[in-house]
Amino acid sequence: MKGQMIICLVLIALCMSVVVMAQNLRAEELEKANPKDERVRSFERNQKRACKDYLPKSECTQFRCRTSMKYKYTNCKKTCGTC
């Protein structure tokens, strides 16, 4: 009985390792099918940090002009400068 339990545990561990290996291979295949070079990844990371708070002229009030920076990064500029 004890031997059967050990064999069962070994089989379960083997099945789990096969599943994990298959998932890793699938992830590698997806990466090969849709490769992104470092420049593209860097650009995407920088776009997330960029200031994207553009106000249409219809919403340009004095208060909105002062508070038009959505993200507080040094490269953010107020985009409502023509109020």
UniProtKB/Swiss-Prot annotation:
A GO term from the CC aspect: nematocyst
Subcellular location: Secreted; Nematocyst
Superkingdom, taxonomy of origin: Eukaryota
Keyword Signal: yes
Residues making up the propeptide: 23-49
Disulphide bridges, residue numbers: C51-C83, C60-C76, C65-C80
Major place of residence: secreted
Signal peptide positions on this chain: 1-22
Family that this chain belongs to: Belongs to the sea anemone type 1 potassium channel toxin family. Type 1a subfamily.
The name this protein goes by in its record: Kappa-actitoxin-Aer3a
